A protein has these predicted regions:
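Mg2+-dependent prenyl diphosphate-binding active-site environment of isoprenoid biosynthetic enzymes
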Residues: 20-138
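N-terminal amphipathic/basic leader segments beginning at the initiator methionine
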Residues: 1-23
């Protein structure tokens, strides 16, 4: 059990490190702070762990899988931000903190979520995701 927990923590750390570097390279915008708030608000990155496990069966490169996992985490964060909106579930708390729309306003939360979804596609076209890996994934 401890070995699995250590692996989950390593994958979460590696995924967050990639995402932090990727976000840092984004064009300056008022949306960066709410995007980071939704993206780095906790969570175990279980989706990335599942992706790494499946990818390892097909002998995919770990770094490529981290890049794919980062895209998945962006999509997940986007879905949580939008799910919490007043027009959806109207949740004011997410992972023990105010929801993105409560902290930054509804319009900003919508745009931050949309930006995370767009960023996921940008990540999928990342230069370090080798063409041969993309073929294996398809």
């Amino acid at each position: 059990m401890k070995k699995m927990k250590n692996k989950i923590n390593k994958i979460a750390k590696d995924t967050n490190l990639f995402l932090k570097k990727f976000v840092k390279r984004q064009k300056r915008s008022e949306l960066i702070t709410p995007m980071k708030y939704g993206l780095f608000s906790g969570g175990k990155k279980i989706r990335s762990k599942i992706l790494i496990d499946v990818g390892s069966i097909f002998k995919l490169n770990y770094k490529s899988l981290i890049i794919l996992g980062a895209a998945i985490e962006c999509i997940h964060a986007y879905s949580l931000i939008h799910d919490d909106l007043p027009c959806m579930d109207n949740d004011s708390i997410r992972r023990g903190k105010p929801s993105t729309h409560v902290k930054f306003g509804e319009s900003t939360a919508v745009l931050a979520g949309n930006s995370l979804l767009t960023m996921a596609f940008e990540i999928l076209s990342h230069k370090n995701l080798k063409f041969s890996e993309k073929i294996k994934i398809n």
